[in-house]
Amino acid sequence: YCHYQGGSDCVALYLRENPQSRFFSGKGLILGGSRAQNPFGKAYCGDLSAILIQNINPLINLIRVPSKKIALMSEWDTKLEAIAESTIDRDITNLSGVPSWFLVLIKHILKKTGRQNLTEVWPNLEVFFHGGISFAPYREQYRELISNPDMHYVETYNASEGFFAVQNDLSVAGMLLLIDLGIF
C-alpha cells in the first residue's frame, strides 16, 4: 500500500507545484527491475519495482509504458531493446526509476535514434521521479542528455521497507516525510 500511495503523493505534490503541467497528456515511462517465480512455490520474488509493476492498479496501466510483459523481462539487454522499441515513438511526459538504470536506457535510445538529446525524442518530457540512489553524481549528465530547460527532477526516498519521503519543493534539496503511509 505505502508504495502506491507514495507514488500518488509524488504526482499530486508535483502537480500542485506545477499547475501548468501536461503530465497526463502523454505516458509515463516506469523503468523497474525484474522478477521471477520462486522455484519452491507460486510466489514471485525479485526487485520491488517489478513486484509493484506486476500488481499495479489496472488504471495506471493506461498512462504508463512499457507493457507489463516488457517491464517484467529479466534479461536486461533484451529488456532495454524492447523498451526502446516500444517507447521511441510515444509521447513520454514523465520518467520514474533509478538514475543509473535510466542513464543506460537514455544513452541506448539516443544511439538508436541518432539524436543528440532526449528532448529531440520526447519533446514533452517534463519530469523525472528518481530514487534508490543519490542523484548528485548523475545530475550534470542528465542536464546534458535532456536539454529542456524546464525539465524537473523530483527526488524520492523509497526502499523495500517503505516509501518514506519525496521532494515537495523543487527549489530546495530537502524532502517531505510521508508520515501517513503506515511507516512511522
Label every model-predicted segment.
Residues 1-183:
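Active-site phosphate/ATP/adenylate-binding loop shared across adenylate-forming ligases
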